[in-house]
Curated annotation (Swiss-Prot):
Assembly and binders: Homodimer and homomultimer. Interacts with NEP. Binds ribonucleocapsid by both interacting with genomic RNA and NP protein. May interact with HA and NA. Cannot bind NP without genomic RNA.
Name assigned to this protein: Matrix protein 1
Keyword Magnesium among record annotations: no
SMART domains linked: Flu_M1_C
UniProt keyword terms in alphabetical order: Host nucleus, Membrane, RNA-binding, Viral matrix protein, Virion
InterPro entries listed in its UniProt record: Flu_matrix_M1, Flu_matrix_M1_C, Flu_matrix_M1_N, Flu_matrix_M1_N_sub1, Flu_matrix_M1_N_sub2
Transmembrane segments annotated in the record for this chain: none
Ranges for region Membrane-binding: 1-161
Organism: Influenza A virus (strain A/USA:Texas/UR06-0195/2007 H1N1)
Amino acid sequence: LTEVETYVLSIVPSGPLKAEIAQRLEDVFAGKNTDLEALMEWLKTRPILSPLTKGILGFVFTLTVPSERGLQRRRFVQNALNGNGDPNNMDRAVKLYRKLKREITFHGAKEIALSYSAGALASCMGLIYNRMGAVTTESAFGLICATCEQIADSQHKSHRQMVTTTNPLIRHENRMVLASTTAKAMEQMAGSSEQAAEAMEVASQARQMVQAMRAIGTHPSSSTGLKNDLLENLQAYQKRMGVQMQRFK
């Protein structure tokens, strides 16, 4: 889910709204936000976001938040995910859907989806959103990340074939998501030891920094320092605590 958060946030323009969306995504993925109707209403009225970005976010929320089976599909998401009404996009979307149906892993689905255009990918999301077809949640997330990568690429004006993610926007967002996750883990580790106050301090500073960077918008390379500082602080803290946690490398 960290990966999904990273890709989705990389297509949201920097500003206070980005920090707010990041918070909503975090809550949704942590199972804290269970009112899909209210969430969609909130999303629909957000300024600045393009219809497609709203459509993708709406799709993510719908996949993640448990809801009653009969809940109405939202028109603003359907309109955004119709591939501009282009029948070619629809044809390609159906072909892609058939492949995704056989693919159950996130990375497999993402790999397949990356060879399609953003229009076909959006149409394919529309198919799934409108319940015309069903794929595993993993596959759907792979499709979402591939779409965001295509969009971030065109925003970045880089059309070279991307095998690994070289896009600075996505790397930057990934560092910020990692920093938030690390901060959260530090707070959980802190417990009641005397170093707890220090850990909480470092974690809350990191949180504030990430929020500020999202709200103000910074150069993608600026987040490298943030991640390094955080990891250094975390490792120093772990040494003193006598804990070695591998997952933050």
